[in-house]
Amino acid sequence: MEHTTVTVNKTPARTRLLRALCVVLAILIFLAVPAVLSPVLEPKYLTQSKEGSLTEEYYASVAETTHDVLFIGDCEVFESFIPAILWEEYGITSYVRGGAQQLVWHSYYMLADALRYETPKAVVFNVYALKYGEPQKEEYNRMALDGMEWSSVKAEAIRASMTRDEYFIDYVFPLLRFHSRWSELTWDDLRYAYGDKPLVSDSGYLMQTGILPADTQAEFTPELLIDYTLPATAMEYLDKMRRLCEERGIELILIKAPTNFWRYHWYDEWDEQVAAYADANGLAYYNLIPEASEIGLDMSTDTYDAGAHLNVYGAEKLTRYFGGILRDTHEIPDQRTSGNASAVWQERVNAYYDRKTAMEAETKP
């Protein structure tokens, strides 16, 4: 008679359990290390490149109160429009979702992200970034996207924004990108790794109190371009922004800030294309360059970098001027009779003037 030999697993149940626990522990450690170290190694953007803090500061603001107007765009919005002044002068609630060289797809996803939390009455988009049809630099992507809360919107924004040398996984696990910052760490990196950082902006407005006059006597000839056609990709994202606003019942307003520095020249040919797009789609478009005198801008006192961008004194003038347009033409309501909004915004106005006083003391000659 043949006998069948049966092999019995003699590994004790306790040993198998310990092995399973070790595997689970290893996985937890693998996941915990990035979670613990990434907040330490990620740039804090508190003293240098403050623009990198702008994206994340929005969430605390919208948790307090919603906004009737969102400004979207590059430095021509976050250094030009002051929500505290809009409130003080007109009772308009607003926020600036801008960033350094914020390209059109960045702005589209900034808007889509904001609409997860609120539905403003109007979105004001600055059109200068329409000149760009491709991702530019990783550092600008990082400043725009690292502070965005995780969602499908952020995932799509990363894919749309990455340069050829970037990888999606580096955004999921920032430790992979910033591991070499060990030698650059400061006390702020440890102090603010897991706690709230001080605000660098006033509702998205990044203040500049310095004064460096523009050379108004100098003549310059803009660089001639081979092709003045605005890139198709940029216009596609502008149209996506328009459709998104339309779906949510939001008015989209296009603007060009009044600065027109030689290095960042706004060509008439570009302006004509934007005006034609606005006309074809029933949008308001304000090119504020010709309105500089009416706004009251004096580029001997209202710029901090020789005419490229406005300082706080120029931004206050522009905000008061454009606030009148928002009130009179676009019927954005005065919310100063709203008790909750008034309390929140009075704190923001006070914080704005406190920052202005402190910064003026630092920049006095």
Which positions does each model-derived feature cover?
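Hydrophobic membrane-insertion alpha-helices, especially the h-region
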Residues: 18-39
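Catalytic nucleophile-elbow at a beta strand-turn-alpha helix junction centered on a G-D-S/GDSL motif
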Residues: 63-81, 309-312
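Membrane-embedded segments
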Residues: 72, 76-159
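Conserved, well-ordered alpha-helix/loop/beta-strand core segments that scaffold catalytic motifs
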Residues: 122-134, 193-294
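Secreted/periplasmic serine-hydrolase-like ester/acetyl group-modifying domain
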Residues: 140-248, 336-365
